[in-house]
């Protein structure tokens, strides 16, 4: 999200301090008196430059790669970018063309894919070029501000969307009958709009005077102002991460409690057959009372099984969605936490004008964060059968009748579930 690039025009300051051979007038001076005298040829400017060289050179380090390293790094980063574009584009296309996937809760999935796709298209290519030329910003001061704005807004939108998804899944599991947003497309669209509005609130301050970006020759770095750093990292990462962890902790507890209520036992399929309702006609009237009572109990149990089987299906589907999003949140934390820890500490260690952190470390953690935009669609495709099937059909250019094929596959899966010996204790 945050990019720091280094200037190449800085050179070490070489200072030569000359002292003349002491004359006879100086020979009688005490050693302490002689040492306090200023060297004869040393100027005020030399002393000022000497004091500056005692401080760490900020922004001097470059990424120096050999030809082979540049090729390998360029290929790897380009593959990450291309796969990120392809994966997130497939998610958006799949939700748009498949009726089964056009659910209000999937608006958030599309928003997440759009944010990740924007990172891959508008941010990653410029970071690749900057890294391959050693860390120098080659695109000018004006575009530096545009680039930082796109970087911050898209990455923040991705993170905040994950946060809203966690809240959506939690409410969907704990309040499946009363949570209206899952059936209300307009309300979900408003939530997506709020996510992008909050992302813009972090992007705009440096463009309007508060906490200006570090934008000098061949250097493009987001503002290192202390207040802005605390505000931006808290809103963009720490608060959303805390909300996600709390939501999934509650989801885990709720799923565990629900699992205890939905223990499965094998119930003989005899009681689900229609023949059970005809037994009383085959028995004598006087000997039918106990049998009739048993038949009524079995009939009620059979009806209860059929009624609750639908609830079981919903319960399993929500559990799977929670597990999928739990993995996504875990991947998000792994990818972004190291970078944001470094970004938060950087201005307090290096000051507000530049970065003194090891450049290779910064770039590695930055690309680890960008990789999260690649991981998200892969996780969805792996855990969502409908999305995975749609991906496969799109990659094989089988666009026609895709909704019909998905409906047939879903019906086949439903029949397989119906044939299982399931019940509720």
Swiss-Prot record:
Keywords: Cell membrane, Disulfide bond, G-protein coupled receptor, Glycoprotein, Lipoprotein, Membrane, Palmitate, Receptor, Transducer, Transmembrane, Transmembrane helix. It is a multi-pass membrane protein. One of its GO terms (molecular function) is G protein-coupled serotonin receptor activity. It is found in: Cell membrane. A lipid is attached at residue 397 (S-palmitoyl cysteine). It comes from the Eukaryota. Its main location: membrane. The chain crosses the membrane at residues 73-97, 108-129, 142-167, 188-208, 227-249, 323-348, 360-383. PANTHER family: ADRENERGIC RECEPTOR-RELATED G-PROTEIN COUPLED RECEPTOR (PTHR24248), IP13425P-RELATED (PTHR24248:SF199). Specificity for G(s) G alpha proteins is determined by the length of transmembrane regions 5 and 6 (TM5 and TM6). G-protein coupled receptor for 5-hydroxytryptamine (serotonin), a biogenic hormone that functions as a neurotransmitter, a hormone and a mitogen. Ligand binding causes a conformation change that triggers signaling via guanine nucleotide-binding proteins (G proteins) and modulates the activity of downstream effectors. HTR7 is coupled to G(s) G alpha proteins and mediates activation of adenylate cyclase activity. Belongs to the G-protein coupled receptor 1 family. This is 5-hydroxytryptamine receptor 7. It comes from Xenopus laevis.
